[in-house]
Swiss-Prot record:
<keyword id="KW-0350">Heme biosynthesis</keyword>
<feature type="binding site">
    <location>
        <position position="288"/>
    </location>
    <ligand>
        <name>Fe cation</name>
    </ligand>
</feature>
<keyword id="KW-0479">Metal-binding</keyword>
<dbReference type="GO" id="GO:0046872">
    <property type="term" value="F:metal ion binding"/>
</dbReference>
<comment type="pathway">
    <text>Porphyrin-containing compound metabolism; protoheme biosynthesis; protoheme from protoporphyrin-IX: step 1/1.</text>
</comment>
<dbReference type="Pfam" id="PF00762">
    <property type="entry name" value="Ferrochelatase"/>
</dbReference>
<feature type="binding site">
    <location>
        <position position="207"/>
    </location>
    <ligand>
        <name>Fe cation</name>
    </ligand>
</feature>
<keyword id="KW-0963">Cytoplasm</keyword>
<dbReference type="InterPro" id="IPR033659">
    <property type="entry name" value="Ferrochelatase_N"/>
</dbReference>
<dbReference type="GO" id="GO:0006783">
    <property type="term" value="P:heme biosynthetic process"/>
</dbReference>
<protein>
    <recommendedName>
        <fullName>Ferrochelatase</fullName>
        <ecNumber>4.98.1.1</ecNumber>
    </recommendedName>
</protein>
<comment type="similarity">
    <text>Belongs to the ferrochelatase family.</text>
</comment>
<keyword id="KW-0456">Lyase</keyword>
<dbReference type="GO" id="GO:0005737">
    <property type="term" value="C:cytoplasm"/>
</dbReference>
<keyword id="KW-0408">Iron</keyword>
<dbReference type="InterPro" id="IPR001015">
    <property type="entry name" value="Ferrochelatase"/>
</dbReference>
<dbReference type="InterPro" id="IPR019772">
    <property type="entry name" value="Ferrochelatase_AS"/>
</dbReference>
Length: 335
């Protein structure tokens, strides 16, 4: 964490002559050490957009019970990932690349549940006398549990800075952009590494949600389904056939009814096939991609004797994704 802070400070100091527009990448964050696992879980399950219990006291009590039941298991997961989440260092690397490619703006990031928090980042941008901000959701599809939670946090942090009133614009979803979907398709083809696509069942795995949240009006499921349909159209245009192309939901928690089918269920259903997974709701690798998809489900695939099991990386700090982000920000300026 100290190394990341040092690099972040250096990066921000180098921008001191600074562009007057800043782009803040918003994401959920992840533990920067095993010590932060408890902080991460506590903040997540105290979020009313995640745990939608209206009574504040009850939400905190239920949240505490969930944290206590999960903390040791979560620590073991992060131990397998080197003692921390990869999300923060990869996001930092992405902002470095963005600042190299586009010195006309200052790119930074804020996390929802672990440092650097939006309040910390915005205080720094106020000192830099930034005149305009772009809050950029790192979630391709919109959900109240992710996008809205991050925006709400960022705007509340901004309101607390009484003398800092920059112009603010937002990018809240980008899944329908053809350039993004071409990058995703190229990532899938790269993971196939000249294997025949028609031999594989392609599963687009996204983070699951309790069905009650979708029933209350959250558009996440609809947008994920639309995203898959757009990718199918692009595959047809480029004549890239798969045995099947499917959408699944991962990371179910608790006894509630969640969106279906689950990723586990589809992997088991296609046990006699070659399977390739693309993490469609994530832009940066995290425990749900590197542990759940690439370790936990891989072991399951081996037990099921699946012929071949591949997991695609997220877009991460790739130059293609960085250029895509810059393009979205440029288009926002011209609108």
């Amino acid at each position: 964490m100290n190394l990341i802070n040092e690099k972040l400070n250096n990066l921000e100091n180098n921008a001191a002559k600074s562009p007057k527009e800043a782009v803040v990448l918003l994401n959920m964050g992840g533990p920067n050490s095993l010590y932060e696992v408890g902080v991460f879980l506590k903040n997540m399950f105290d979020d009313p957009f995640i745990l939608t219990i209206k009574n504040n006291f009850m939400r905190k009590m239920v949240g505490k019970m969930i944290v206590n039941s999960r903390i040791e298991k979560s620590k073991k997961i992060y131990e397998k990932l080197g003692g921390k989440s990869p999300l923060t260092p990869i996001t930092f690397a992405l902002t470095e690349r963005l600042n190299e490619l586009d010195p006309s703006r200052f790119y930074t990031y804020a996390m929802r549940y672990t440092p650097p928090y939006a309040s910390m980042v915005l205080q720094d941008l106020a000192l830099k006398e930034v005149e305009s901000l772009v809050f950029f959701s790192m979630y391709p599809q919109y959900s109240s549990t992710t996008t809205l939670s991050s925006f709400n946090d960022a705007f509340n942090a901004l309101k607390s800075l009484e003398t800092f009133r920059p112009k603010v614009r937002v990018i809240e979803r980008f899944y329908a952009d053809k350039k993004l979907n071409e990058i995703i398709l190229n990532t899938i083809l790269s993971a196939l590494n000249n294997r025949k696509s028609q031999d594989f069942v392609l599963i687009f795995s996204v983070h699951g949600l309790p069905k009650s949240i979708v029933d209350a009006g959250d558009t996440y499921q609809q947008e994920c389904e639309h995203h898959v349909s757009l990718l199918k159209e692009l595959m047809q245009q480029k004549n890239i056939p798969f045995k099947e192309v499917l959408l699944s939901y991962q990371s179910k928690l608790g006894p509630m009814k969640w969106l279906e089918p689950s990723t586990e269920e589809l992997i088991e259903k296609h046990r006699k096939s070659h399977v390739i997974i693309y993490p469609l709701a994530f832009t940066i690798d995290n425990s749900e991609t590197l542990y759940e998809l690439d370790m936990q489900y891989r072991l399951m695939a081996e037990r099921l004797a699946i012929k071949e099991y591949l997991v695609c990386p997220c877009l991460n700090d790739s130059i293609e994704f960085a250029k895509f982000i810059i393009g979205l920000v440029e288009n926002l300026k011209s609108e």
